[in-house]
């Protein structure tokens, strides 16, 4: 295929783990016809149709199998890479930029957080899922760190799939984990649609790129979305917490200032003995620079944080931080999804930081409901 795949189609490509892509054959040439191309396994399972490609002319094609968007610089500047699968795709930054015209501003922000974060959301087809489960025991022999290192036989760094914990009963908590099955229960040990990987984009790159394209068509919308990305998140639940706590009150957020995401905190000697490490990372750290007080928000989801061993590590980390005088709030998906519980958390944070608490007006509460629906959405639906 000679055309450059972009926008939502490219977004789905970049969400697909390399070990999944390696299971598929190359795409047929578009000279064989777009109908044949659209029936290839990788398109059916991952890219979906219509395939969105860039066009440097005024011609706009819209069909069941293909759609083009006008983009003058697509074939004059280096904006794409060769996938090795028989087609080229826009790089992650230009993928986000070309998505601007076809997704909501909130979905664009979520996509930016995902590309800048340590996670991706992808649900394999049933056949691919079986193939992945067969290699699950082999993957479990490696640590998270080793999965981020290339060996001599690998072209790309494999991603680490997050598996569900045992005894998960409540389907509501699955909302932040993309509702992996339709029954409302995630099977014990079953692979979820959450994957861990290195960030595709550095957050500084995103902000520089946004400033560069601000004057172009759709550039202002892209720039405004990029301004809302304020840190490097490790899960969709963290993104939801960040946006609900940092967004302006008129937009439904709590409008806390001085928020830091996955902030590094050196531990005291006694805290090191508890945690067994020299430093800890707080999911969301909110600071009052005047009083020099800080609270730490720890986002907790069973599937997000994986195994019981990881949960035990979270507990020791929280205890270590509390021993140093930090107020640590353990927040779940259900708490974020309930106005009264979230409001109580915001009230408590204000008290700890000696900030003035202001109840939300009815209009602000309506805006919060809309924001909550957007950020606690099914992440698999972004870009569809």
Model segments located where?
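Short gly/ser-rich loop at a beta-strand->alpha-helix junction or flexible surface loop bordering the NTP-binding
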Residues: 1-217, 360-361, 369-384
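Surface segments flanking catalytic/ligand-binding clefts of nucleic-acid enzymes
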Residues: 155-174, 178-180, 185-384
């Amino acid at each position: 295929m000679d055309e450059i795949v972009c926008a939502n189609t490219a977004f789905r490509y970049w969400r697909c783990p390399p070990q999944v892509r390696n299971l598929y054959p190359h795409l047929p040439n578009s000279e064989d016809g777009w109908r044949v191309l659209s029936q290839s396994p990788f398109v059916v399972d991952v890219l979906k149709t219509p395939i969105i490609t860039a066009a440097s002319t005024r011609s706009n094609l819209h069909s069941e199998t293909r759609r083009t968007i006008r983009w003058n610089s697509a074939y004059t500047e280096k904006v794409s890479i060769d996938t090795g699968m028989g087609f080229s795709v826009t790089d992650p930054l230009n993928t986000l930029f070309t998505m601007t015209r076809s997704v909501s501003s909130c979905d664009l922000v979520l996509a930016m957080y995902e590309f800048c974060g340590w996670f991706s959301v992808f649900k394999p087809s049933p056949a691919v899922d079986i193939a992945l489960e067969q290699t699950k025991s082999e993957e479990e022999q490696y640590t998270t760190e080793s999965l981020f290192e290339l060996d001599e036989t690998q072209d790309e760094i494999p991603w680490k799939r997050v598996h569900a914990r045992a005894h998960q009963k409540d389907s509501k908590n699955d909302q932040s984990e993309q509702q992996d099955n339709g029954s409302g229960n995630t099977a014990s040990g079953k692979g979820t649609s959450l994957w861990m990987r290195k960030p595709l984009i550095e957050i500084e790159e995103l902000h520089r790129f946004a400033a560069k394209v601000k004057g172009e068509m759709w550039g202002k919308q892209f720039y405004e979305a990029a301004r809302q990305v304020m840190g490097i998140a490790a899960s969709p639940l963290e993104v939801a917490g960040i946006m609900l706590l940092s967004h302006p009150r008129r937009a439904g957020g709590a409008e806390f200032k001085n928020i830091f995401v996955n902030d590094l905190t050196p531990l005291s000697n006694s805290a090191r003995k508890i945690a067994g490490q020299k430093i800890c990372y707080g999911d969301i750290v909110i600071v009052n620079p005047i009083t020099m007080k800080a609270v730490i928000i720890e986002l907790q989801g069973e599937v997000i944080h994986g195994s019981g061993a990881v949960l035990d590590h979270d507990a020791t980390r929280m205890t270590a931080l509390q021993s140093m005088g930090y107020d640590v709030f353990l927040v779940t998906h259900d708490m974020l999804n309930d106005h009264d519980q979230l409001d109580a958390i915001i009230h408590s944070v204000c008290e700890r930081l000696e900030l003035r608490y202001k109840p939300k007006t009815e209009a602000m509460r309506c805006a919060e409901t809309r924001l909550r629906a957007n950020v606690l959405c099914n992440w698999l639906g972004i870009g569809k």
